[in-house]
Structure formats: C-alpha cells, structure tokens
C-alpha cells in the first residue's frame, strides 16, 4: 500500500495539473498520454518494476540515465497510459504505480502530460473515451 500522505500530495498535484491545463485551453475531451515517472539507482531494480507495469497493461519507455541536481546519476523510465483528463482515473493509476514502486523499491516521481490543442488538425478526431474505465490496469 502506498504511503497515504504521499498519495494525498499526488491527488492535490493531479488536480492542479488538470486545472492548469484546462485554464490554458487544453482540450477537455481529448485522450491524453499520461507519463508516470519512475527512477532507481540501478537498471536491474528499475527493470523489475517496469516489467511489472507492462504486465499490468501499461506501455513502458526505454530506461535512460539522468543526472539529478546533486550530480548523482539515476536510471529512469516513463510508464505510459492513455486516458481522459479525469482526476479519478489518474488517481487510480497513481495509487497503483506508487504501490508498485514501493514494492520494487524505486521512486515514483509523479506524472505529466502535454497540452492538447482543441483546434488541432492532427486527424485523430475519433478518440474514444471509455466511460467504464476505472484507470486501473490489469
């Protein structure tokens, strides 16, 4: 079980991210690629968590090295999902991935996404939003 205080902090952060995106004019009806960030001190530890996330139905990016502020090197990857900009759906994913991170002793470093232009001409106007999606991947 993920730390309740950290979960609450993430819930607040989720609502802030969504609010800021919508205030900036991002499309409220778009499907968003949600990038959950994981990091670890070594590749083997991160790979175990990434494999488990993949088994749960998430896409996983290739690991890469990142130098953090104090000069240390960490190995990181993104755990990807696609969903509506819905706080409850994202909260469910965050809780699932924070629990996974705790299990494998890796860091859950939050999530992010990108602005979706409601007037964008990307030809992907047939986005499907699954109203029954509870955010948890199996």
Swiss-Prot record:
<dbReference type="InterPro" id="IPR016716">
    <property type="entry name" value="RraB"/>
</dbReference>
<dbReference type="GO" id="GO:0019899">
    <property type="term" value="F:enzyme binding"/>
</dbReference>
<comment type="function">
    <text>Globally modulates RNA abundance by binding to RNase E (Rne) and regulating its endonucleolytic activity. Can modulate Rne action in a substrate-dependent manner by altering the composition of the degradosome.</text>
</comment>
<dbReference type="GO" id="GO:0060698">
    <property type="term" value="F:endoribonuclease inhibitor activity"/>
</dbReference>
<dbReference type="InterPro" id="IPR009671">
    <property type="entry name" value="RraB_dom"/>
</dbReference>
<dbReference type="Pfam" id="PF06877">
    <property type="entry name" value="RraB"/>
</dbReference>
<comment type="subunit">
    <text>Interacts with the C-terminal region of Rne.</text>
</comment>
<dbReference type="GO" id="GO:0006402">
    <property type="term" value="P:mRNA catabolic process"/>
</dbReference>
<dbReference type="GO" id="GO:0005829">
    <property type="term" value="C:cytosol"/>
</dbReference>
<keyword id="KW-0963">Cytoplasm</keyword>
<protein>
    <recommendedName>
        <fullName>Regulator of ribonuclease activity B</fullName>
    </recommendedName>
</protein>
<dbReference type="GO" id="GO:0008428">
    <property type="term" value="F:ribonuclease inhibitor activity"/>
</dbReference>
<dbReference type="GO" id="GO:0042803">
    <property type="term" value="F:protein homodimerization activity"/>
</dbReference>
<comment type="similarity">
    <text>Belongs to the RraB family.</text>
</comment>
<dbReference type="GO" id="GO:0060699">
    <property type="term" value="P:regulation of endoribonuclease activity"/>
</dbReference>
<feature type="compositionally biased region" description="Acidic residues">
    <location>
        <begin position="118"/>
        <end position="138"/>
    </location>
</feature>
<feature type="region of interest" description="Disordered">
    <location>
        <begin position="114"/>
        <end position="138"/>
    </location>
</feature>
<dbReference type="InterPro" id="IPR036701">
    <property type="entry name" value="RraB-like_sf"/>
</dbReference>
């Amino acid at each position: 079980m993920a730390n309740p205080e950290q979960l609450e902090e993430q819930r607040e952060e989720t609502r802030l991210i969504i609010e800021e995106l919508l205030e900036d004019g991002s499309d409220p009806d778009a499907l968003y690629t949600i990038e959950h960030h994981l990091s670890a001190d070594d590749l083997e530890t991160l790979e175990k968590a990434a494999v488990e996330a993949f088994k749960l139905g998430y896409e996983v990016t290739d690991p890469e090295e990142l130098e953090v502020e104090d000069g240390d090197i960490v190995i990181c990857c993104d755990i990807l999902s696609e969903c509506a900009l819905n706080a409850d759906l994202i909260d469910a994913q965050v809780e699932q991935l924070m629990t996974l991170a705790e299990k494998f002793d890796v860091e859950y470093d939050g999530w992010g996404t990108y602005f979706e232009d409601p007037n964008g001409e990307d030809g992907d106007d047939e986005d499907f939003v699954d109203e029954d999606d509870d955010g948890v991947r199996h």
